[in-house]
A protein has these predicted regions:
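Short, flexible helix-loop junctions that flank or precede catalytic/ligand sites
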Residues: 1-325
């Protein structure tokens, strides 16, 4: 048990988002989702992997004797003075070998959130002064939720902020946080309807992934709320295309869209990750909603990459890696 606790404490100290306990041949691989990439944390004997899964399932009130059917669980882990919420998901493969994914939900802190260009944050903050819809895109682990939470926290002392997520990724006492539970009939649409009756000032929608959720999000923005949300898109222009694909009429988007932000985490030369944004707002955004002609990254993205290289913030190789987003 001490070895398990040591591994988990190391994972928490590195602020790893997800731990994958995966069977591989005759042993287990512990994979860590860190800075948007899946990296090998360690390889362990099969017995260790099975015991780790059993230990965590027991702590999360999951059925330890069930190795094939999917299960969900939750627990709280204490790492020194810090309390971290864990969400667990297990399933067995056709050979009866069990795998487990653990999501670590941390308190929101600013010491690990670095901006490649702080002036971009100021530009984002100006969008908060208008009611409407601000959407974020970027790969898993690029910091979208952290960005939305930091923005909403700017308003939380004087306004009610409600989040709807699957699952909740950050523990934030200033917000009303709702979690999707499809088994209980509490999906995005149902919780959005509930939220509208609860009269928050600000909504955070974890993911807009179907036409019904997209239209309800638009309705929330039209009714005077500030709504922050995420969609799957490869770049800032793709956010608009994705909403159109989900059936949102462009005339609604013209009325509610306040900003679009695509973001990536880049590794700085000092070894710390930093966020770079590619943003659309104002007349540029409205023009894109009307014409939908944009493709790829904006000229500003390329400019910031070149500037970061010239200032020695990132290497030319790092810039080349993210040239296309």
């Amino acid at each position: 048990m001490e070895a398990f606790e040591k591994d988990l404490n190391v994972i928490i100290s590195r602020r790893i988002a997800d731990l994958y306990v995966l069977p591989f041949k005759n042993y287990y691989r512990l994979m860590a989702a860190e800075q948007g990439q899946l990296k090998l944390f360690k390889e362990v004997p099969q017995d260790y992997g099975c015991r780790l899964i059993t230990y965590l399932k027991y702590r999360a009130d999951m059925a330890v004797s069930e190795h094939r059917r999917p299960q969900l669980g939750a627990m709280t882990w204490h790492c020194g003075p810090e309390k971290v919420n864990l969400r667990l998901s297990s399933v067995g493969d056709y050979q009866g070998r069990e795998s487990l994914v653990v999501r670590f939900i941390y308190q929101l802190t600013d010491d690990r959130y670095h901006l490649l260009f702080p002036e971009q944050w100021q530009e984002l903050k100006t969008m908060l002064h208008r009611r409407g819809l601000i959407l974020f895109a970027g790969p898993m682990g690029s910091g979208k939720t952290t960005t939305m939470y930091r923005l909403a926290r700017e308003l939380a002392s004087k306004q009610v902020v409600m989040t709807i997520e699957d699952p909740v990724e950050i523990n934030e006492p200033w917000f009303i946080q709702l979690q999707i539970n499809d088994l209980a009939g509490m999906g995005y649409q149902q919780l959005l309807r509930l939220g509208l009756r609860h009269r928050p000032n600000v909504f955070i929608i974890g993911e807009i992934r179907d036409p019904q959720t997209a239209m309800m999000t638009i309705q929330a923005a039209l009714s005077g709320h500030l709504v922050l949300g995420t969609v799957h898109a490869r770049d800032a222009y793709g956010v608009i295309a994705r909403l159109i694909q989900l059936g949102v009429p462009s005339y609604y988007l013209e009325q509610v869209m306040t900003g679009v932000c695509y973001q990536r985490l880049l590794m700085q030369t000092d070894g710390t990750p930093a966020v770079l944004f590619d943003q659309l707002n104002g007349t540029v955004l409205i023009k894109e909603v009307k014409k939908q002609q944009g493709r790829g990254m904006t000229d500003a993205w390329t400019h910031y990459l070149d500037q970061a290289v010239s200032l020695g913030q990132i290497t030319p190789e790092e810039a080349a890696k993210y040239q296309n987003g």
